[in-house]
Amino acid sequence: MNKQKQYWTVGIILGIILIVLIIFWVRAANRNNTPQDPHAGHSIEETSAGQTTGTTPSSSAAGAQDSDALTSYLKEQDQIMTDMMDAMTVEPTGNASVDFLKGMIPHHESAIDMSLSYLKYGGENEELKQLAKDIIEAQTGEIDQMNQLIKEIGESGVKDEAKEEGYLAAYDEMMSSHAHMHHGTSTAKNVDEAFAEGMLMHHQMAVDMSKAILDYTDDEEVTKLAETIIAAQEKEIKQMDEILKQAK
């Protein structure tokens, strides 16, 4: 009987040992199967795709917005230029100075519109943003000045059809040379470059007009205005040209 109890005791002890061994074995197996890589569970394609593109949804959206802004700005700029060229058709008045002023007013108005459009579509270059604001302020003042000069010259009754003929010949040649500027020619990658590229050509047109009138006007105020336009806009042409070179 004692021997039988010993057998039962030994059997129970062996059973307990076996159970303990099974528990340790199960725990060890679970530890070995636990993923150590924080990226475990993600496919190779997902990981490599993220590393390769280096883009995020937010950056992709920003790029799309920039592209939309550029497209919209260029479309608006082309329309501004088309309207300007139509408005700059000058009917002879008998005075070259008046003809010059009547052509330069819509030219200035389009420069203001281009600057407002640039600011609206989110230009980021601080130097160009300040230039756009300066153009709006300066050329708004010059438009007021030109309207006053047209009134004063008209009241004086001064006519010189020979000089007017010479000026209009130069004016028509200048208009022909600038007739297709902007349309489908932009190589800009963003709104900043598009504005600088377009305004540079626009300024050159104003400089050409102003240089032309100097040969055909006897009006001191018109001469001063033309010289002011030449000096200011040639300086801004150099400024925009430098900005475009830095962007290359």
Model-derived regions, located:
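All-alpha RGS (Regulator of G-protein Signaling) helical domain and cognate RGS-like helical scaffolds
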Residues: 25-248
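N-terminal Sec-pathway targeting helices
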Residues: 2-16
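Juxtamembrane cytosolic interface motif at the C-terminal end of transmembrane helices
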Residues: 7-9, 20-30
